[in-house]
Amino acid sequence: MDDKTFTKELDQWVEQLNECKQLNENQVRTLCEKAKEILTKESNVQEVRCPVTVCGDVHGQFHDLMELFRIGGKSPDTNYLFMGDYVDRGYYSVETVTLLVALKVRYPERITILRGNHESRQITQVYGFYDECLRKYGNANVWKYFTDLFDYLPLTALVDGQIFCLHGGLSPSIDTLDHIRALDRLQEVPHEGPMCDLLWSDPDDRGGWGISPRGAGYTFGQDISETFNHANGLTLVSRAHQLVMEGYNWCHDRNVVTIFSAPNYCYRCGNQAAIMELDDTLKYSFLQFDPAPRRGEPHVTRRTPDYFL
């Protein structure tokens, strides 16, 4: 089908997804193939221009993603950069990730989607996305289309050469952005090594490198962040990956900011969510938001497993 016809169809898919209605299996397959063509051209350190709005974990909380767009502006009117973790834990991982990928295919210059530690075959089999795909489609094909696509997602982004965005954090194997550019990202997230660290590491109050309680990645201190930012001409590392009660949290003397965009995480944590708006001079402001009003969602009684992922 020609580009014009496909764009028309894509607009219909986006409209449908905005109503939280899933696409059928064939449509998902087509969408993922188109997305691969776009993502394969993107760098491990994808260059992004400001103004842009930077978002953290969404975790299948579709109605809260709608609230995020309400607060931050619709795509493509607002440029967005999402730092991973679209799936697992929330009840609408399928609709959430399908919508974000559809927006990426429709407006490739207006939205950037990075890989999080949950964009992985192994993690999604444990934390909900795999089971949700089985439940909603009756087989694992859609799960396979998406997890194959996840291998293509860029690992990091660089806003105007100054603000470095990624899901997790820094790595003892990586001193420069060129080290990241040289990685082969087209694979499942490894258990260890630089690619793993970028998606799993966390900032810490202690200096230097530490063993991560998550069992993957490292903890890194302010000395590490300052050295990395200085060596690479950066003003800030922006990352997600950790629940923060106000939706955003500065650390390491403002060398690092954590942004978390899933309010009342797992429908039980009681946290606010936030997004970071960067204007055309790279001035930042944070917009906080609470959960969208919900109708007819399963009442959460099961205690969510203690999480370190």
UniProtKB/Swiss-Prot annotation:
Mn(2+) 2 binds at residues 85, 117, 167, 241. Its EC number is 3.1.3.16. Its cofactor is Mn(2+). Reversibly methyl esterified on Leu-309 by leucine carboxyl methyltransferase 1 (Lcmt1) and protein phosphatase methylesterase 1 (PPME1). Carboxyl methylation influences the affinity of the catalytic subunit for the different regulatory subunits, thereby modulating the PP2A holoenzyme's substrate specificity, enzyme activity and cellular localization. Binds 2 manganese ions per subunit. It catalyses: O-phospho-L-seryl-[protein] + H2O = L-seryl-[protein] + phosphate; O-phospho-L-threonyl-[protein] + H2O = L-threonyl-[protein] + phosphate. The modification Leucine methyl ester is found at residue 309. The modification Phosphotyrosine is found at residue 307. It comes from the Eukaryota. GO terms for cellular component: chromosome, centromeric region; cytoplasm; FAR/SIN/STRIPAK complex; nucleus; spindle pole. The active site is at residue 118. Keywords: Centromere, Chromosome, Cytoplasm, Cytoskeleton, Hydrolase, Manganese, Metal-binding, Methylation, Nucleus, Phosphoprotein, Protein phosphatase, Ubl conjugation. It is found in: Cytoplasm; Nucleus; Chromosome, Centromere; Cytoplasm, Cytoskeleton, Spindle pole. GO terms for molecular function: metal ion binding; protein serine/threonine phosphatase activity. Mn(2+) 1 binds at residues 57, 59, 85. Belongs to the PPP phosphatase family. PP-1 subfamily. Catalytic subunit of protein phosphatase 2A (PP2A), a serine/threonine phosphatase involved in the regulation of a wide variety of enzymes, signal transduction pathways, and cellular events. PP2A can modulate the activity of phosphorylase B kinase, casein kinase 2, mitogen-stimulated S6 kinase, and MAP-2 kinase. Part of the striatin-interacting phosphatase and kinase (STRIPAK) complexes. STRIPAK complexes have critical roles in protein (de)phosphorylation and are regulators of multiple signaling pathways including Hippo, MAPK, nuclear receptor and cytoskeleton remodeling. Found in a complex with at least ARL2, PPP2CB, PPP2R1A, PPP2R2A, PPP2R5E and TBCD. Interacts with TBCD. PP2A consists of a common heterodimeric core enzyme (composed of a 36 kDa catalytic subunit (subunit C) and a 65 kDa constant regulatory subunit (PR65) (subunit A)) that associates with a variety of regulatory subunits. Proteins that associate with the core dimer include three families of regulatory subunits B (the R2/B/PR55/B55, R3/B''/PR72/PR130/PR59 and R5/B'/B56 families), the 48 kDa variable regulatory subunit, viral proteins, and cell signaling molecules. Binds PPME1. This is Serine/threonine-protein phosphatase 2A catalytic subunit beta isoform. It comes from Oryctolagus cuniculus (Rabbit). The gene is PPP2CB.
